Structures are given as C-alpha cells and as structure tokens.
Amino acid sequence: MRKILVLIFCLNLFGVTQQAAAEENKTVDVVLIGGGIMSATLGTYLHELEPNWSIDMYERMNGVAEESSNGWNNAGTGHSAFAEMNYTPEKKDGSIDISKAVVVNESFEISRQFWSYQVKNNVLKDPKSFINSVPHMSFVWGDDNVNFLRKRYAALQHSTLFRGMEYSEDANQIKQWAPLVMDGRDPKQKIAATRMPLGTDVNFGVITHQLVDTLTKNPNFKLNLSHEVRDIKRNDDNTWRVTVADLTRDGKETTVNAKFVFIGAGGASLTLLQKTGIPEAEGYGAFPVGGQFLVTTNPEIANQHLAKVYGLASVGSPPMSVPHLDTRMLDGKRVLLFGPFATFSGKFLKNGSLFDLLHSLSTSNLMPMTHVGLDNFDLVKYLVGQLMMNDDDRFAALKEYFPEAKQADWKLWTAGQRVQIIKKDDEKGGLLQFGTEVVSAKDGSIAALLGASPGASTAAPIMLHLMETVFKDKVATPEWQSKLKEIIPSYGHKLNGDIEMTNKIRGYTSSVLQLDYIEVKPETN
C-alpha cells in the first residue's frame, strides 16, 4: 500500500512539473502589459477581429484600472475640444487655429462609436454606468481673454463638429448655465463663456472593468493580476520572451513567449520599452507630472452644478494643468472636482517607485532630457509655483471659479501620474511633448504607448492607429476591413465637413449611449 501511495505521489509531482514546464515555455499570440483602458481596448478589438488568437494580459496590481484609468485618478472628461482652449491656439496674426481641435473631436467620435458597438453586443453594460451627458463650457474673464474666446467660438463655427455650441457675455445667461460660477462674482467683471450640450463625463475605470470582464469569458484570454513584467527580450525566431514575476508568490518569475507584445503600462511603459532594445526606443525620455484635485461630495453643492467648466492654462504649463470645475459621476454619486494642481515626484505610476525617473535615464535620452530642462523655463517656473502652494492657495484658485465656496466642504485628492514624452530632436536636442505616441518595432512585433493627454478619451482611435501600424497586412484584408467598419461605421471617413455623416453617426451613438443629441445645421453667414 505504501508503494502505491508513493507511486501516486510521484506521478502527481511529475504531472505538476510537466504542467509548470509547459506554462513556462508557452507561446501566445498576444501579450498585453498593463490592465488599463488601452490594453482593454486593444484586447477587445483583437478578440473581435481574431477570436481564435490567444491573449495574455499582465497587471501588477490586484485589479484592473487601478492606476490612471481609475475614475478617481483622472478628470473623466470626454475630450472633444469643446471646452479645452489649449487645443485652439491663437496664431501670430491673431486668428485661431482649430486644426488640433478638429482632430481631437474626430478622435472622440471614434471612441463613441467603439463604445456603442460594445453596448449593442453586451460587452459594455448600462451606458449610464460609464458615460453621461455633461455640458462642456469655456469660461474666461478680462478683455483679452474675452476677445480670444469670442474669436475661438467664431472660428469653431466653420467646422461641422462644433455647431450647436452657444456663446454669451451676459452674466444672467451664464448664471443659468453654471450658477455656482456666477454666484458672488463681481458684477463689473467682464466675462464670457461658451457651452456645448454634447459634452460628456466618462468613467474610464468602469469601461476598463467591463471590457476585461467580457474578455475573461473567452477561453483564449487569460488575465494575470498581481503579475509584474520584469523583462522583455527578442527570441531568435523574432517572437518575444516576456519575464513575469508573480507578486503573490514572492516574485517567482516565469516566462511567456509572444508573437506580439503591447506595452500599455501607463507611466511604466518607457522603462519596459527600453528593455526591448529596439532602436526605435532610443532617445525617448519621460517627465512625470502628478495631479491633485479639490473634491466635494456634498450633494447640496454638487446638485447645483452640471457642467465641466474649463478656464485658461498658465503660459508654458502642460495641458493637464488647465483649471476646470467638473461635474463627475463616481461610485454612483454626483460629485464636484476642481483642479488640477501639479505635483512632482520621481514616480512614473501612482503606486510606483520614487526611483522610476532615475531608472529611466540612459545614454540615449540624457542629453534630450537636459535640453528640455534648459529650454522649458516656463514649465519649470509653473511647477515650482504649484509645489509651493498650500491649502489656502489652492482654495483661492477654486474661488476664482466658485466665488462662494467654503473650504470645509472640500478635501484634497491625489490623482494619477501623467508621464510626458521627451524626444530626441536634431535641432533643439530634446523636445517635450504633451500628447500620446505609439512607438513600435520596424517589424510590428512590439509596440508601446507613451504620453498622457488626451489619453483615455482617445483609446479607441489610438489603438486603431496602432493596429494599422503593426498589423498593416491584416487591416488591409476584406475580413478586417468589414469588421472594423461594423465596429466603427465612419471608419475611413472624416466627419468634419460632412453634415449628413456627422448627424448619422452622432444620432446613432447618442441613441445607443443615451446621450444628448443636437442636429448639425449648415453654416450660416
């Protein structure tokens, strides 16, 4: 009997060993690094385009959407350039450049179509759980700023995408739009505002959770939480060997081979990209800027304000510094956020290491980062000013947008880290970029997303662009073309300038997502 038990034990041990070896040497079609909105979006696209592909997702936290995608770690703005004045700079001749605003708006229309398709197919659930109509407003004071906003509004009316926007310099009208902004304000102050009813508040954390929840029902998808990617190296057959540490087992490391790797790890993407050794990654650096918000959950205050009210950013400051007073729907409640206020640490992630910035330095990015530091005095000045702010200073900033605010109603909340891109530049040595950028190997076998703004709002178009880059041949096939046009009905077409298409697409997404809709009319002289 003892011999039989020993034999059974040995066979079981052998079986476990064989299974571990198989796991150690397994090859999958796709590895997604990071459990945020970007990886969730790409994973969803790929599952719908290639249902038989095997996909592994690795996330270092014990849940998805715990970093920048979490609803509390970002402003939740569905960035459409309705209110964000940094997307419409004034040119030297005094005219307003709306080209960036059009691009941002077109991008968000793609996101709306992607989410609508997922709702129709029960991938995403009740739309109200993740997106709600909240008017987007621009608000300014002072003669120069009022003149700028007046010109901005006029310029945007030449685009079909911004028709339906309202403009006013009348205090009573603006008070109807945003009473908290006007109550207690000096009646002699010259003010102006625009209001776009098509604005939205989006909870990207909820979207991420719902996308990943659906993916986990697919036997070809495997979610690995509390797993940290430590290394990425190319194999002889041009696949990638990804080394992963299981944080629930004292960091025990295993490897997985992948035909394609996406690095969507937010602020941690740069250091992982550097480990790949691909020449395309050389010269990239990163600069982390954190954010804090003042928050009130007092329903008596929150229920008086239904808008995202954007002001003007300080000269030289990053886009994420634009002050705004926002209606948010978080954890089933309506709350107000004001900010952001910049913070600085060496961390690339909210739950990262203080040494992240130091570890990212290399011989290829040291000079670009040095040049950026020397050439961006306005940014340095802005950050120093922000870091010197105390509670009274932050409250004074809030009172510029909410004159009758009471300090006792507000608390300070630390949001996520925004890691800005620094690129090598032949002319200037280094450039600081505030957007997002896909960096991929020449053969398309690995890609990373770097940068911050506009970020999550444009996850669907960014991942679409990534697929067009790394799966170029696949995207060109009739099968992928047909499916992509099913997911994104406007795929291959620009909405700007096409009134019929704009109304058709917005009517469709507004209906599915239960959002406000305004029919676009021809431009009036």
From Swiss-Prot:
Q: Which GO terms describe its molecular function?
A: 2-hydroxyglutarate dehydrogenase activity; L-malate dehydrogenase (quinone) activity
Q: What is its EC number?
A: 1.1.5.4
Q: In which pathway does it act?
A: Carbohydrate metabolism; tricarboxylic acid cycle; oxaloacetate from (S)-malate (quinone route): step 1/1
Q: Which UniProt keywords apply?
A: FAD, Flavoprotein, Oxidoreductase, Tricarboxylic acid cycle
GO biological process terms, semicolon-separated: tricarboxylic acid cycle
**Pfam families to which the protein is assigned, alphabetical:** Mqo (PF06039)
Q: Which reaction does it catalyse?
A: (S)-malate + a quinone = a quinol + oxaloacetate
Q: Which cofactor does it need?
A: FAD
At the top level of its lineage, which domain of life is listed? Bacteria
Q: What does the sequence similarity comment in the record state about its family? A: Belongs to the MQO family.
PANTHER family per the record?
Answer: L-2-HYDROXYGLUTARATE DEHYDROGENASE, MITOCHONDRIAL
UniProt name for this protein: Probable malate:quinone oxidoreductase
What species is given as this protein's source?
Serratia proteamaculans (strain 568)
